[in-house]
Curated annotation (Swiss-Prot):
It is an enzyme of class 4 (lyase). Pathway: Cofactor biosynthesis; (R)-pantothenate biosynthesis; beta-alanine from L-aspartate: step 1/1. The keyword Lyase applies. This is Aspartate 1-decarboxylase. The gene is panD. It is found in: Cytoplasm. Binds 1 pyruvoyl group covalently per subunit. One of its GO terms (biological process) is alanine biosynthetic process. Catalyzes the pyruvoyl-dependent decarboxylation of aspartate to produce beta-alanine.
Length: 126
């Protein structure tokens, strides 16, 4: 069996730019790409916490340490500057690989600087 598991996520990043006339993508601060292991041109899912929009695009690198999270092209129509988003990437793997796999979870502050990282999500309580 082939499974698709969460590979990485950037949790509650703040959209800094929305560029409708730029070639489609999401530009992400290079430090965040490195911390998550998301590769340039990799497909990512965007979940807008502010307005509920959900869509996919591909990642491109923004300047390291810039805090840039820029939705470009058609994706810019789904967000506004200041929206909080989750950026997620998934990876395919076998059931055996999935048994030991741990995702790279990156949590950011209001300026999109890394506040902490983890490899698991706490159990949700009632």
């Amino acid at each position: 069996m082939h499974l698709s598991l969460l590979k990485a996520k950037i949790h509650r990043a703040t959209v800094t730019h929305s560029e409708l006339n730029y070639e489609g993508s999401i530009a992400i601060d290079g430090l965040l790409l490195e911390a998550t292991g998301i590769r340039e041109f990799e497909q990512v899912h965007i979940w807008d916490v502010t307005n509920g929009a959900r869509f996919s695009t591909y990642a491109i690198r923004a300047e390291e340490g810039s805090g840039i999270i820029s939705l470009n092209g058609g994706a810019a129509r789904h967000v506004q500057v200041g929206d909080l988003i989750i950026v997620a990437a998934f990876a395919g793997m076998s059931e055996d690989e999935a048994k030991t796999f741990k995702p790279n979870l990156v949590y950011v502050d209001a300026h999109n600087a890394i506040s902490h990282t983890n490899h698991s999500i706490p159990t949700q309580a009632a």
